[in-house]
Regions:
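The feature represents the first ordered module of a protein
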Residues: 1-36
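C-terminal partner/receptor-binding element of secreted or periplasmic proteins
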Residues: 51-76
C-alpha cells in the first residue's frame, strides 16, 4: 500500500470504506485492513485526470451501497 493510502486509511476507519489506487488499479479498503479488500479491473491510467486525483487522495464511503454508486462511474 502506498504512503498516501496509509495516511488516509486511519481517518477513513470511522466511515467504513476507502476507494483508492493500488498497483495502478482502483481498489477498496475496509476499515482496519492494510491490504485492499478488492482490486477492480479498472486501470487508473484510463480514468480522467480529476478521477485519478480523487482516487489518489482516497474517496471515503460509509457503506457498501455508497461504494457501488461510486464504482458505477468508473465502470461506465
Amino acid at each position: 500500500m502506498n504512503r498516501t493510502i496509509s495516511k488516509l486509511l486511519s481517518p477513513a476507519l470511522a466511515l467504513g470504506f476507502l476507494l483508492g489506487i493500488h498497483e495502478g488499479r482502483v481498489a477498496l479498503w475496509r476499515d482496519g485492513e492494510a491490504r485492499p479488500e478488492q482490486i477492480y479491473d479498472i486501470r487508473a491510467d484510463t480514468l480522467p485526470p480529476a478521477d485519478r486525483l480523487q482516487l489518489s487522495r482516497g474517496i471515503r464511503a460509509e457503506s457498501r451501497e455508497k461504494v457501488w454508486l461510486l464504482l458505477e462511474n468508473y465502470f461506465d
